[in-house]
């Protein structure tokens, strides 16, 4: 289902090895996508509860309204991914890149993501625990010119 090769996909700039997949509206509970190169893939409304997405490249992927409860996302790249409305409760997100992600309405309660990179992402539009919100706000402050539309 995924690359699963010996090398780290985040260190290999060769995008020709990327496998675009469409898992929209499918159940992939406890699936293994470890070290997968799935840049630009679609996981819209997929059920990825307890799935293993560690050490992979999921940049520019569509995770809108996906269920990713207790999924392992450690050490993966999600740069530019769309997580609007996704359920990531209790997901393991430490050491992952979430640069320029869309997070409006995403449920991030209980995640382990204090040491993730949230640069350019709209984390303030997501549902967060108070302690995680403080930790993220300290490192990746909310832009001062942002006007809240709610």
Regions found by a protein language model. Name each.
Residues 1-150:
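Tandem repeat scaffolds
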């Amino acid at each position: 289902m995924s690359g699963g090769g010996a090398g780290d996909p985040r260190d290999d700039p060769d995008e020709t090895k990327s496998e675009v997949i469409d898992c929209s509206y499918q159940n992939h509970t406890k699936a293994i996508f470890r070290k997968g190169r799935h840049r630009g893939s679609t996981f819209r409304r997929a059920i990825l509860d307890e799935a293993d997405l560690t050490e992979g490249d999921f940049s520019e992927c569509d995770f809108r309204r996906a269920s990713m409860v207790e999924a392992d996302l450690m050490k993966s790249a999600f740069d530019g991914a769309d997580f609007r409305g996704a359920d990531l409760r209790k997901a393991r997100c430490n050491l992952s890149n979430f640069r320029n992600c869309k997070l409006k309405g995403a449920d991030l309660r209980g995640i382990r993501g204090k040491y993730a990179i949230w640069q350019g992402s709209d984390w303030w539009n997501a549902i967060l625990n108070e302690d995680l919100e403080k930790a993220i706000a300290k490192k990746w402050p909310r832009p001062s010119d942002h006007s809240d539309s709610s």
